[in-house]
């Protein structure tokens, strides 16, 4: 396994694979890796000859007062984990390598599907994601890119700009990886105190309860209200509890498939989760 820190170095490492027409897979991360990230790498290994994992804490997707400065940088530990699952190349650039030293005048913005959910509470976040992922796609030039479905809205944004900008790759969404108690794996779970970690699985428990209620024919808006109450009663500060169609348009009682979304803070830690529900009205 190689580690490259410059765009030129990565290109040199990938040139032999390109010349041999090998299939290149790409997993973008911000490091502080967990089993969810490693699952993405394993999925990439199934489809691709060469797998590149980027580790870059991207400043443009953090808003004021968010955790950019405190976000864990664990490159040595991440490298060991990636070697164990067969990663071929780590790309770990500096901020200067990715953005240069001159003023940045170009932005990439995806409208409509970023207007609510995490987009309303984290203004500018998805613009930062779209910019850095586009830059990484241009640098790596993969055949496939792999993203977790925990960040469902982010995945939708990436699919949208890949389609709109004719970026020649396929985006693969990988199902959420959960702890045994149902909590969706996230690098930010490490911010939770032991007591908060015991409470955090209530999000998934509530989503599963909501799914069951929908299958029983309960009113969608009442189900969402009950889920919000459950979270509030357990100490969460709820950002949103929403239902959407898979394309992120507003969902109704009569849609056959919906996605339930939750974002809530537990102490100072913001947690997100979602559950896709195949729903047949009673």
UniProtKB/Swiss-Prot annotation:
(R)-pantoate binds at residues 61, 154. It is found in: Cytoplasm. Beta-alanine binds at residue 61. One of its GO terms (cellular component) is cytosol. It catalyses: (R)-pantoate + beta-alanine + ATP = (R)-pantothenate + AMP + diphosphate + H(+). One of its GO terms (biological process) is pantothenate biosynthetic process. GO terms for molecular function: ATP binding; pantoate-beta-alanine ligase activity. Pathway: Cofactor biosynthesis; (R)-pantothenate biosynthesis; (R)-pantothenate from (R)-pantoate and beta-alanine: step 1/1. Its main location: cytoplasm. InterPro entries: Cyt_trans-like, Pantoate_ligase, Pantoate_ligase_C, Rossmann-like_a/b/a_fold. Keywords: ATP-binding, Cytoplasm, Ligase, Nucleotide-binding, Pantothenate biosynthesis. The active site is at residue 37. Its EC number is 6.3.2.1. Homodimer. The reaction proceeds by a bi uni uni bi ping pong mechanism. Belongs to the pantothenate synthetase family. Catalyzes the condensation of pantoate with beta-alanine in an ATP-dependent reaction via a pantoyl-adenylate intermediate. This is Pantothenate synthetase. It comes from Acinetobacter baumannii (strain ATCC 17978 / DSM 105126 / CIP 53.77 / LMG 1025 / NCDC KC755 / 5377). The lineage of its organism: Bacteria, Pseudomonadati, Pseudomonadota, Gammaproteobacteria, Moraxellales. The gene is panC.
């Amino acid at each position: 396994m190689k580690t490259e820190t410059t765009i030129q170095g990565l290109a040199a490492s990938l040139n032999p694979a390109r010349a041999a027409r090998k299939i290149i897979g790409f997993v973008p991360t911000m490091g502080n890796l967990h089993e969810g990230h490693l699952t993405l790498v394993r999925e990439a290994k199934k489809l691709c000859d060469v797998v590149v994992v980027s580790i870059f804490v991207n400043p443009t997707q953090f808003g004021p007062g968010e955790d950019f400065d405190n976000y864990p940088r664990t490159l040595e530990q991440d490298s060991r984990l990636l070697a164990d699952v067969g990663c071929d190349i780590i790309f770990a650039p500096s901020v200067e390598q990715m953005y240069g030293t001159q003023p940045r005048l170009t932005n990439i913005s995806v409208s409509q599907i970023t207007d609510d959910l995490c987009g309303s509470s984290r203004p500018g976040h998805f613009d930062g994601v779209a910019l850095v992922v586009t830059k990484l796609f241009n640098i790596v030039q993969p055949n496939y890119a792999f993203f977790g479905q925990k960040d469902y809205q982010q995945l939708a944004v990436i699919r949208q700009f890949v389609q709109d900008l004719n970026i020649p790759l396929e985006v693969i969404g990988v199902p959420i990886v959960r702890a045994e108690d149902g909590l969706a794996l996230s690098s930010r779970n490490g911010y939770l105190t032991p007591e908060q970690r015991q409470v955090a699985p209530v999000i998934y428990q509530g989503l599963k309860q909501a799914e069951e209620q929908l299958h029983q024919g309960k009113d969608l808006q009442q189900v969402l209200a009950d889920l919000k109450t459950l979270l509030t009663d357990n100490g969460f500060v709820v950002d949103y509890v929403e239902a959407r169609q898979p394309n992120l348009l507003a969902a109704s009682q009569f849609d056959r498939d919906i996605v339930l979304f939750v974002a809530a803070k537990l102490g100072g830690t913001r947690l997100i989760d979602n559950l896709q529900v195949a729903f047949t009205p009673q």
